[in-house]
C-alpha cells in the first residue's frame, strides 16, 4: 500500500492470490490466535493464552515485561515508505533494552518468511506489506499470530495514564481483528482518493469536481488541451478499486457496502450505486479520458506520467507523495480530493473520504521474543516516532493528532485536511483486505477490460457478483464478517 499496502506494493495497498501462507502476485502484480490472560510479575516463560511467551518482570517503565538483552528480530517491508522509520524506533529499543535489533529490509516478505513460519522459527515482528506479503488470514487461522490486546491495554509511552488503544483511530482497532483476536496492527493511516496537482488546476482555472457530472465536463475541457484527464496503473488495475469501491459506499450507503464486504447474495447486482459508479468508469473509457497506454503501465510508470503532467488525475493512496518524490516537481503542490457526488440520492455527504489503517504489522506468536515485538510497536506509537514517520515518509499514522502543529508536506497536509473535513464520514473497505484474490485478480481482470472499453458495465456487474458468489461458496476461503 506505501506503502502498499502491498500495494508497492500495498497496504492495503497490493495484492494477489493467496497460495499456502504466502500471497503470490496475480496478473503480474508488483504488492488466530491465542486466547487467555495476560502476563504479570512472575517472569512467565510460557505462553499463557493472549499473553506473549518469554516475558520478564513488568514495571511502570516496562509494562509488557521485556527481558533486557533478549534478541529481537524485525523484518520490515522496504517499499514506498522505506524502512528508516523502523530503524529509528529500533535504535530507541536498543538503548532501552541493551540489544541491537536484527533488522532486515526487503520487498520479498512472503518468499523469505513463508518457509520460516512453516519451520517454526519466524522473526519476532514483521511489516507485512508489498505484493509478496504473507497471507495473514491463513496465519491467523493457524494460530501463528500473537494477539496484541496486551499491547492495546498497555500504558502509552507519552502518557502512562492513557492506554495505547486510547491514542488510536477507532478504525485501527476494528481493522486489526480476526474474529475475536486483535492480531494485526495497521501502523499507517492511508487516505485513498483522486490525487492531482493543485498548482496545475489553479494555473488552468480548473476546479476540483464535486460530482460525476462535473468530472465528465472537466475531463472534456482537459482533453481539448492535449492532456489526458486520467491515468492508472493498468498492470495493477486494483488501484482503480481504491476509488471505485469507496464511491459505491458513498452513493449507496455503508450498509449496502457492508453486504458486499460480507459476500452476501445479490450484494453487487441489487445495489443501484454499483450500476451508477461502474457506468461512470465505462463513460470515462468510452470518451477516451484515460491516458493512452495506461493499460500497460506499472504503478511507478503511471505516477511518473502524472507527475510529469501527462495526466491530471490518478487513483492512489497517500504513500504516493513519498513514492513519486523522485519525479515530482518542487512546485507540483500535490493534493487529494474527496469522493464525488452521484446525485441528490447519495446516502453519504460531500466530503466523504476513504481513509483507513494500512501498513500491517504482525508479531509471530512462535518468535523468540514476541513481547519485544509488541514493545517495538509501542515505541513506534509514541508521538516522537509518529511524527518521525510523518516527516520521513509523508504519511499519517494510526496515532490520533500526532501531526498537530507540524509543518507538513503538500500531499500530507492535503490528506490531513481531508480527514478532518471528512469527520465521521471516513470509509473503511474490507473486501480488498479480506479477499485479495477476489478483488485483485478476479475483479481486477474485469476492471482492466472495463477501462479499455472491452467490457460493458452490465457485464462487469454480472461477473463481479458471479465471482463473489463463488468465493462465498468456497469452503477453502476463510470468511469474515463485519457489522459496521
Description of each model-found segment:
Residues 177, 186, 415-470:
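C-terminal capping/gating helix-and-loop segments adjacent to ligand/active sites or protein-protein/ligand interfaces
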Residues 91, 119, 203-204, 287, ...:
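Extracytoplasmic/periplasmic substrate-recognition and gating elements
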Residues 174-187, 192, 216-266:
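Extracytoplasmic/periplasmic solute-binding protein
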Residues 219-222, 262-294:
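Glycine-centered hinge/linker elements that transmit conformational signals in sensory
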Residues 1-11, 18-32:
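N-terminal secretory signal peptides
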